């Protein structure tokens, strides 16, 4: 089977905000072009969302790809390579990766909700990648749909001409054939030279139990054939190709992949570390010298410790993280130890949803029971002797007297919210030490830009934003700069012992409120022991908040009937002595729920 003529190939991705229907549109495109039969599609929604967790939450986490055959109205046969991308801000890395492999994008906007913050972010990614963009209005069959208003919004906010936007309902299939024609007529074919030396972009890689590492590639020039020896230019590792093929969405093997095509290769690669996303693949015998411009590697923004509840699970956790790292290039981890929690890992994530998803995948796919420590960001510190250091973990913070300056990362947040919730949204941003930059109106919705410290966003900002706006506000952010900050290290002491897993860096003005909220929450969740347990929040040697868990008390005087008071007193004194001793040597068991709840408190 020879590869298709390059003019008849269209590589495109679907960009949209969460829940605007891009995975459903992908289902319809697969169905209409015959990628899967109606029988195979029956009872299956979001075909490309292969993880259970993706279907349950209704979000796309991993970018997926599928190849479709389509006979257009002009009578020619076309090949479409569709990349379904995530919409959530944490997975922007997956988006940029997919966009690098395509020439065009379908911009899907919900006709009842309009342009959202992450729609904007993803469109800008697509424009940066030099894409041709076709606007598609989805859910036009809903009673609340306002297509004309949304078209105007696309023109006002994004600056795209939406006069010939395609009107569809992905759920019912209405207008979807028009999308297929628009892909043919309005998106450009890829460029490439079949006779040139092999040059291909490594788009993604994941681990398959039977095949080893599977690599998703986009061929730019030349041809990839079975049996060919290839070289990864970034890692300098060479392999013999065993299988070459594409997804329909099922894995289908072919003899070769030509320029402009997107497909997969397997080559007995054992280490996913050898396949760096964004790397250039070339022919080992006739290598090219210039690498393709890769995309920027993902930089972890949020760090937290993950520890197994059962210490015997440590090796299982190490293996599980290695496997997830195979499929998720943006996830990083290194070993760490904690006095309270034993051995575990310090992990880096792109954001809080990313953290939650990884944690959930570890517990589901590998049956691990984990404790997560307080999420933190990267702080830069200048010491009094002039040296500079970066801190990922509050436990590593040097002595206060040695620190000349602490700098924390700031972000620029773009929030789109219906007008009636604007006051609550602005108050939330002010409470989080934000500085308002601009406020504009798009119809009945306000678009507000704020500078915020990332430290204030990583805990629960997204949840709070959703609750103050009844779920209507959308949010997107990017890192801007580091600024000096008045931060202090707050520790939580349980029975006078610091719990390192709960220490955190907080702004001095918010330390007391946060400390009080945490100790109150811990008091509710630590079960009573045989002795009194003080729970304290401290900055340095100063206690800023305290709660006490009352002791369980056995009635030692129960069998004394009347008689002399000294007998009772003697028994009570004896009990008191015993409790004193217990408190000295007793160990307090802190349940996992107490850790999780303490980290989720809002000061």
Swiss-Prot record:
Gene Ontology process terms (BP): positive regulation of translation
Keywords: Cell inner membrane, Cell membrane, GTP-binding, Hydrolase, Membrane, Nucleotide-binding, Protein biosynthesis
A family per Pfam: GTP_EFTU_D2
KW Coiled coil (keyword) present: no
UniProt cross-references to SUPFAM superfamilies, sorted A to Z: EF-G C-terminal domain-like, P-loop containing nucleoside triphosphate hydrolases
Localisation: Cell inner membrane
GO molecular function: GTP binding; GTPase activity; guanosine tetraphosphate binding; ribosome binding; translation elongation factor activity
NCBIfam families (UniProt xref): lepA, small_GTP
Record protein name field: Elongation factor 4
